[in-house]
Amino acid sequence: MNVSRFDLKTMKKDAMNHIFDLETHPIDDLSNPAADKLVTRCQQELEAVGCAVIGSLVKPESIARMQAEAERKVDAAYWACDSHNPYMTKDDPLLPHGHPKRFFEKRESGYINSDVLDEGSDLNAIYDSQILLDFISACFGVAPIYCWADPLGSHPYSVMADGHYFPWHFDGNDFTVSILIQSADEGGLFEYAPNIRSTENENFQAVNAILHGGREGVRTLRLRPGDMQLFKGRFSMHRVTRVKGKTRRIIALPTYVVDPYTVNRPERSKQLYGRALPIHYEREKHRSDGLTD
């Protein structure tokens, strides 16, 4: 991919000690022995189970600011109540009824899209941060990586209220960073099947088994507000269990890719974010892998 033919996001090297606990997790200095140890742990966990967590990386005061922003913006969220398969594609009647591409579950959730965040948002600062980008690149062992060009889905808040459920699915991007902003009263647990597919093998049989209730290889993750999760969502199928109670589950989703030209396909963008923009149609056919989305 020749990245010189379009503009890349301009990153900022601002100090991030107003957002990150850099005393405990000195991710701003990757030569620091503590940072090196943290990167090594994350690399090992990502290799083994496709997921790593840095506990309490984001300071409580930053979490409070993002929580307040999400609550202010909740009326601008796109709320979906529809059905989708794990690939966010339309039904294909040419496939047999038992194929996972024909397995649809009802999803209820909302997204506060990236393009409606406040200019001074902590989440914008996180996504603009060269410090975080370098740390994430080191953890995933991939360089260079880039911020996602998708103007709606690059770093939204996901919001789930009482009764909401986000079914099994794969991500359309390479790497997702999740920061829990607010836990639900009950439920809202993250479940995933690590590395269940690869660019060489969609592994439809194993995917189908989990869709129909199988638990082999499924892991459950309990995040706390301020925790940062690194996740290979392109290859690990995942879901969020049903939320219960008055307190919304809110999570920030900064998203990164190896190919900066990619964006969501129009169908996925409409399902998740309520609309598709010209960029989604212009780049629809561009994919760096041959996977079903």
Residue ranges: model-predicted function:
Residues 189-195, 199-293:
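Catalytic core of Fe(II)/2-oxoglutarate
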Residues 1-48, 276-293:
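Fe(II)/2-oxoglutarate
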Residues 43, 63-64:
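Short functional linear motifs
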Residues 58-59, 65-77, 97-150:
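Signature of the catalytic double-stranded beta-helix
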